[in-house]
Amino acid sequence: MWLLEKAGYRVRTAEARALQAHPSLVPKRQARGSPSRCNPNVLTPDRIPQFFIPPRLRDPRGAEGRVDRNPGGRNLPVACSLPHLAGREGWAFLPESPHTRRRESLFHGPRGLAAGLAPAQSRLHVSAPDLRLCRAPDSDTASSPDSSPCGSPHTPRPQSLSPDEASSADTSPYAPRRAPPLFHLDFLCCQLRPTKDSVLRLGPRGGQLRLSTEYQAGPGRLRLRLVSAEGLPRPRTRPGSGGGGCCVILRLQPRVRPGAQRSRVVQSSCNPIFNEDFFFEGLRPPDLAVRSLRAKVLDRGAGLRRDVLLGECETPLIALLPPLAGGLGPGSSLAPTHLSL
């Protein structure tokens, strides 16, 4: 106490200074019965506002002012799995009240659905898949559901149209468009072109090559597909040669452009699978009888090593052609008439 008195501290003086302070610094005790003051945005048990959803107003336009958003008359598929959210035009959307933008209005359904009367156009339509293989030639009338195997939900166009109406219907943005074909016509023709599978024996150490040949007389294109090689001999381990993998070299004799074509390299396999196509252009029908195919199978050298020959063969080109490719084949005459599918 003596030390505090020397420092100038007095107990009574400190209490007097505290009482003389600003009254806002000293909290006042509130009476128990007085209501508590708080922010009006804070919800308390005794202050719960009453939510009010205004009633739906009538549309001033009425039924006459409605605009048909689907002038083409087509039933468009709805991209929604909830039937109660499908509108009258067939689109899936959340209706909004014209007099409020509250979140509660998003859950209000259309009038027809609320009254229990579902509109005829609000049903979900799922169009059947288009199984047409190629595009049919254009015509004035669309295919009817009776003639189509799957039945199209689109309404058919009128069968009789004047020249003016036909021209305007084709250029209209709402004119029905045919769906793209499932398979292109070139893809189907490629499947219908005749091909021939051949097996070439390799010498002198054995093995064979499997080829598939196709010839198009129109552009004069020869396609050789190298499928695989079987029974290749083991590469001899010599210092400074081989060890890089197996590849095949194909060329036509006498040489034509492009010259020798090389396949990809398959590592460490006696039965490599290639599945590669080789094309030779500019081959006329008279040239097929005087040319031959020469194939070489090499063991590629790795780094500075040299290539090692595993086998080779040479076969007349006419023996590899399919029998239906313009009547060409062993023992057939080279006539200028050729079939090109």
From Swiss-Prot:
Pfam families: C2. Residues 139-149 have a biased composition (Low complexity). Residues 56-75, 134-176 are annotated as: Disordered. InterPro entries: C2_dom, C2_domain_sf, C2C4C/C2C4D. Residues 205-331 form the C2 domain. Residues 56-71 have a biased composition (Basic and acidic residues). It comes from the Eukaryota. CDD domains: C2. This is C2 calcium-dependent domain-containing protein 4D. The gene is C2cd4d.
